[in-house]
Amino acid sequence: MELKLLNDQGQAASNVAAPDTIFGRDYNEALIHQVVVAYQANARSGNRKQKDREEVHHTTKKPWRQKGTGRARAGMSSSPLWRGGGRIFPNSPDENFSHKVNKKMYRAGVCSILSQLAREGRLSVIENLSVEAPKTKLLSQKLKGMGLDSVLVITDSLDENLLLASRNLPNVLICEPRHADPVSLVFYKKILITKLALAKIEEMLA
């Protein structure tokens, strides 16, 4: 598999060889779905909380006598059938949403995503991406000149100017290879990888 190698102006200069074991895999939609869902589920904090009939504010006094009123039987105001009553099966903050995915499956899913991106022409390699100063305008103009509006940039190391310049751009994310997660790879329209970062990705996923 050969990927387009861009120069600093975003123009295709040449091609760079990439291993087929990472960028030449078949598209496995079921595996990609499993990996993405598992990653999102594992990121959940689990902070939902609802009260059961014991925790809501209530009194144990019987609202009316058992018989003779013609109304339905009622025991106390915390009944889940009543307005303001407790939930029957409340959500708890200690609920575990995590999904287990084996390392081999995770790597295979990421490789399948990268392979599909390469086939669609959405993945490119660049010699280096940098800005002279931590200015959002400079980075925005550079990316606009390359025709990139929604892009994930994977660099071998985080450049402070580049990181600060990208913070106010909603559709731009700068990260290192170890932080390139499957959700980000699927979300952004274009993926830009520096040449040194490509070597690290090959080492990680080999």
Swiss-Prot record:
Listed GO molecular functions?
rRNA binding; structural constituent of ribosome
Q: Which UniProt keywords apply?
A: Ribonucleoprotein, Ribosomal protein, RNA-binding, rRNA-binding
Q: Which Gene3D superfamilies match?
A: 3.40.1370.10
Q: InterPro entries attached here?
A: Ribosomal_uL4, Ribosomal_uL4-like, Ribosomal_uL4_dom_sf
Residues covered by region (Disordered):
43-78
Q: One Pfam family, short name please?
A: Ribosomal_L4
Checking SUPFAM superfamilies in the record gives: Ribosomal protein L4
Q: Which GO terms describe its cellular component?
A: ribonucleoprotein complex; ribosome
Highest taxon, organism lineage: Bacteria
* Family, per entry: Belongs to the universal ribosomal protein uL4 family.
| Main function | One of the primary rRNA binding proteins, this protein initially binds near the 5'-end of the 23S rRNA. It is important during the early stages of 50S assembly. It makes multiple contacts with different domains of the 23S rRNA in the assembled 50S subunit and ribosome.
User: What name does this protein carry?
Assistant: Large ribosomal subunit protein uL4
Coding gene?
Answer: rplD
